[in-house]
């Protein structure tokens, strides 16, 4: 749960960083109405007409099952997705290229870095990589 003070700080920093470059008026997040991850991903898929989607880390399919892509691969060694491997194991034999890759796997710095580097090898030109939990404690 984010405190009111934290919300204020985030809104303040967001406006300092982005308002000057992108927006003409002050932007405030409506914290209770933020879109879900799958809504953001589906909007990107729809707007850019992406067809091939890869998700690294699909815990219980909370996100993966709601993705509307023609072709989707979900990699998780424990639960969710449609490939039961670690991301390292998957990328060793990967032959696919993806329009959109969502990284939400093991949340350790070294593994996140590996997942980003591996994803870049299999990202189509003009593709997008999204990260969740990109500030691990390690």
Model-derived segments and spans:
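A short alpha-helical cap/connector motif
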Residues: 1-102, 106-138
């Amino acid at each position: 749960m984010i405190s009111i003070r934290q919300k204020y700080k985030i809104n303040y920093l967001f406006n300092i960083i982005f308002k000057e470059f992108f927006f003409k008026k002050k932007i405030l997040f409506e914290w209770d109405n933020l879109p879900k991850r799958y809504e953001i991903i589906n909007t990107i898929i729809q707007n850019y007409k992406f067809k091939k989607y890869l998700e690294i880390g699909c815990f219980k399919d909370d996100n993966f099952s709601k993705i509307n892509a023609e072709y989707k691969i979900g990699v998780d060694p424990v639960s969710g997705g449609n490939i039961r491997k670690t991301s390292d194991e998957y990328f060793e034999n990967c032959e696919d290229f993806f329009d959109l890759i969502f990284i939400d796997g093991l949340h350790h710095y070294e593994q996140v870095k590996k997942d980003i580097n591996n994803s870049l090898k299999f990202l189509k030109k003009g593709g997008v990589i999204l990260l969740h939990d990109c500030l691990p404690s390690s």
